[in-house]
């Protein structure tokens, strides 16, 4: 195989914003290696997001690609109100009061979007403003006012984020905005929901219920772990979510920054064991917002996330508003390809086998992985309606590429985050002979040479969630 022409197995998620929303730039990002377009619904109107979605669908059609759409919710975040002059200066030792009235505030007295915070906080706790740039120590609660002492100097602009570490907040998970955004996403055909600030399993179930009510139960829900309560409940959250995003920005404010690498590894390991997708996000190539080359620490960060076992790596400001969005994607692709070339695939496979469940589908996928390793097969062609077989195979981290052949266009995009999987749209294959014939065609289209071996695997036609067949063949 001409391996220098293969795209990375690790998937790349790109946040789309002013720097990348034109058709020309989106096309360049797709060609550079973008697998998933992330739309951040904390910003922008439905009309603006719809335009981006339609543009991507046009590009997918023109390039015969399957780039997926991820809707990232605003979530139940807390923000400051506005300040006189658009910003305010906090001084160490000053008294600062957080109130419920909607005022244009100053550092002495300002409002926030969550009006019941006074019911949740306790004296001695911290309220962190603007990603922890300003720390407010809660002194006491006076009626509905939270009286704080400022722990450091800092400048805060309008509508900055508020974090309250260690406090279980009392608000409902789904806001009216999120409900409207999720309903819009269902209508627009998005493939993934990144649910922000998930604290408990019920938050995911609330999103799932809304998707079902809107006729889109197949949309996969990625729970963003970005607060201490989410970390505490990660095992239960993982049981009901389709995957996890390690959202290191807010997480690094809510918990000690030195704990974030450990939590990242723990979340990735748990997702790998459960066969759930995992995205590592935030500040991966942050300096490339301004510079054409990453720092060496950033390169190591991306590589180490891949060594940890992440399915996908994500760009935020780098691709949304940075000066070098295409270069950032190209850099991620280069790092991923280099890192994947040094992975210990045998060790990864053994680890997957140790944590595998015992059922027929798992046994078939396990056998496929072992045969692929022993015979050094060029590709695994998985025929799948729902994506089940390809997702199962991805868990085993085979060195061989996994080609998911499906008659379902939605499934081609639903597999966009799964590590090592390339999806292609095909007609329904109901016989073994048809599958064997088509497998050879798409293998050669994906740079498999005549004489190389491939494995063909499939489930029972028309029955989702099964994998019951495998065959080793030589490409003619």
Residue ranges of model-derived segments:
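Non-catalytic helical/linker scaffolds that mediate oligomerization, partner binding
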Residues: 1-476
């Amino acid at each position: 195989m001409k391996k220098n022409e293969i795209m990375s197995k690790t998937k790349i998620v790109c946040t789309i914003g002013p720097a990348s929303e034109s058709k020309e730039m989106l096309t360049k990002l797709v060609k550079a290696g973008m697998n998933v377009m992330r739309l951040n619904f904390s910003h922008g109107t439905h009309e603006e997001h719809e335009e981006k979605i339609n543009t991507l669908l046009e590009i997918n059609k023109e390039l015969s690609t399957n780039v997926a759409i991820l809707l990232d919710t605003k979530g139940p975040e807390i923000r400051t109100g506005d300040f006189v002059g658009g910003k305010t200066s906090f001084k160490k030792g000053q008294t600062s009061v957080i109130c419920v009235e909607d005022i244009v505030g100053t550092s002495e007295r300002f409002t926030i979007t969550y009006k019941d915070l006074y019911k949740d906080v306790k004296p001695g706790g911290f309220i962190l403003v603007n990603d922890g740039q300003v720390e407010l120590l809660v002194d006491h609660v006076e009626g509905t006012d939270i009286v704080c002492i400022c722990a450091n100097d800092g400048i805060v602009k309008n509508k900055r984020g508020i974090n309250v570490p260690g406090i279980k907040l009392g608000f409902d998970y789904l806001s009216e905005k999120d409900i409207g955004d999720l309903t819009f996403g269902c209508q627009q055909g998005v493939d993934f929901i990144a649910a922000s600030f998930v604290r408990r399993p019920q938050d995911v179930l609330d999103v799932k219920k809304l998707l079902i009510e809107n006729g889109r139960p197949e949309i996969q829900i990625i729970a963003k772990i970005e607060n201490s309560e989410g970390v505490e409940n990660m095992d239960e959250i993982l049981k009901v979510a389709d995957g996890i995003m390690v959202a290191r920005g807010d997480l690094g404010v809510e918990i000690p920054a030195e704990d974030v690498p450990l939590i990242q590894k723990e979340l990735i390991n748990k997702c790998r064991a459960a066969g759930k997708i995992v995205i590592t996000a935030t500040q991966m190539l942050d300096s490339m917002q301004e510079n054409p080359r990453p720092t060496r620490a950033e390169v190591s960060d991306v590589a180490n996330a891949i060594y940890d076992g992440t399915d996908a790596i994500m760009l935020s400001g780098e691709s949304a508003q940075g000066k070098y969005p295409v270069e950032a994607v190209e850099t991620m692709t280069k790092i991923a390809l280099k890192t994947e070339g040094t992975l210990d695939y045998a060790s990864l496979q053994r680890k997957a086998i140790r944590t595998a469940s015992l059922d027929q589908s798992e046994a078939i996928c396990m056998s496929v992985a072992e045969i692929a390793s022993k015979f050094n097969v060029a590709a695994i062609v998985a025929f799948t309606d729902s994506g089940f077989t390809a997702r199962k195979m991805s868990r085993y981290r085979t060195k061989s590429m996994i080609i998911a052949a499906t008659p379902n266009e939605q499934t081609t995009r639903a597999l966009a985050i799964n590590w090592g999987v390339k999806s292609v749209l095909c007609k329904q294959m109901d016989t073994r002979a048809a599958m064997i014939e088509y497998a050879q065609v798409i293998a050669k289209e994906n740079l498999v040479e005549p004489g190389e071996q491939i494995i063909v695997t499939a489930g029972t036609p028309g029955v989702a969630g099964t994998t019951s067949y495998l065959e080793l063949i030589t490409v003619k």
